[in-house]
């Protein structure tokens, strides 16, 4: 996934770090194999749901685009049941 960096400020950074995910782990997620689950529109803003393996843990992230930069809005570690469900879905899609 190509992008021009991250959009961090006093609004989104504390919220993302508040779930125990480090800045390095969040950024590693997007520099590795990230899976885009879906987009939705909240108000006038398109939000994208993504997950992947970043810095040794499965991570779930809601983000939006600011130009070519990623603006994480909420980030957390995934629960085992979520990981299993999404990995199974990826396997099914890759078999097609």
What are these regions (language model features)?
Residues 1-96:
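Ribonuclease/tRNase effector modules and their secretory precursors
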């Amino acid at each position: 996934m190509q992008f021009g960096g991250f959009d961090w400020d006093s609004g989104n950074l504390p919220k993302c770090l508040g779930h125990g995910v480090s800045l390095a782990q969040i950024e590693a997620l997007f520099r590795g194999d990230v899976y885009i689950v879906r987009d939705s529109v909240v108000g006038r803003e398109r939000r994208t749901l993504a997950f992947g393996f970043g810095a040794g843990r499965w991570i779930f992230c809601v983000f939006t685009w600011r130009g070519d930069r990623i603006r994480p809005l909420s980030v957390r570690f995934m629960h085992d049941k979520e990981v299993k469900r999404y990995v199974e879905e990826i396997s099914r899609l890759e078999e097609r």
